[in-house]
From Swiss-Prot:
<keyword id="KW-0411">Iron-sulfur</keyword>
<feature type="binding site">
    <location>
        <position position="19"/>
    </location>
    <ligand>
        <name>[4Fe-4S] cluster 2</name>
    </ligand>
</feature>
<keyword id="KW-0813">Transport</keyword>
<dbReference type="InterPro" id="IPR017896">
    <property type="entry name" value="4Fe4S_Fe-S-bd"/>
</dbReference>
<feature type="binding site">
    <location>
        <position position="15"/>
    </location>
    <ligand>
        <name>[4Fe-4S] cluster 1</name>
    </ligand>
</feature>
<feature type="binding site">
    <location>
        <position position="9"/>
    </location>
    <ligand>
        <name>[4Fe-4S] cluster 1</name>
    </ligand>
</feature>
<keyword id="KW-0479">Metal-binding</keyword>
<feature type="binding site">
    <location>
        <position position="50"/>
    </location>
    <ligand>
        <name>[4Fe-4S] cluster 2</name>
    </ligand>
</feature>
<dbReference type="GO" id="GO:0046872">
    <property type="term" value="F:metal ion binding"/>
</dbReference>
<keyword id="KW-0004">4Fe-4S</keyword>
<keyword id="KW-0677">Repeat</keyword>
<dbReference type="Pfam" id="PF12838">
    <property type="entry name" value="Fer4_7"/>
</dbReference>
<dbReference type="GO" id="GO:0051539">
    <property type="term" value="F:4 iron, 4 sulfur cluster binding"/>
</dbReference>
<dbReference type="InterPro" id="IPR047927">
    <property type="entry name" value="YfhL-like"/>
</dbReference>
<dbReference type="GO" id="GO:0005737">
    <property type="term" value="C:cytoplasm"/>
</dbReference>
<feature type="domain" description="4Fe-4S ferredoxin-type 1">
    <location>
        <begin position="2"/>
        <end position="29"/>
    </location>
</feature>
<feature type="binding site">
    <location>
        <position position="38"/>
    </location>
    <ligand>
        <name>[4Fe-4S] cluster 2</name>
    </ligand>
</feature>
Length: 83
């Protein structure tokens, strides 16, 4: 399942540099996560780094992009060319 940033985002910019896949960018009003690039840090880290650093806990699982651990790993391999 990809992650998403809720409208509670305060645009503090701490999440964007933490994403190893470059999935986070500045949107019109808040930061956004590109679901096709978000692996919840599977393949890179044990936990989602953006969630760890967010000071307002506004990064949650995106219910419209449900994925299994295997699907996230396959996405990681596709993005990085590893596997």
């Amino acid at each position: 399942m990809a992650l998403m940033i809720t409208d509670e985002c305060i645009n503090c910019d701490v999440c964007e540099p933490e994403c190893p896949n470059g999935a986070i960018s500045q949107g019109d009003e808040t930061y956004v996560i590109e679901p096709s690039l978000c692996t919840e840090c599977v393949g890179h880290y044990e936990t989602s780094q953006c969630v760890e650093v967010c000071p307002v806990d506004c990064i949650i699982k995106d219910p419209s992009h449900e994925e299994t651990e295997d699907e996230l790993r396959a996405k990681y391999e596709r993005i990085t060319g590893e596997g």
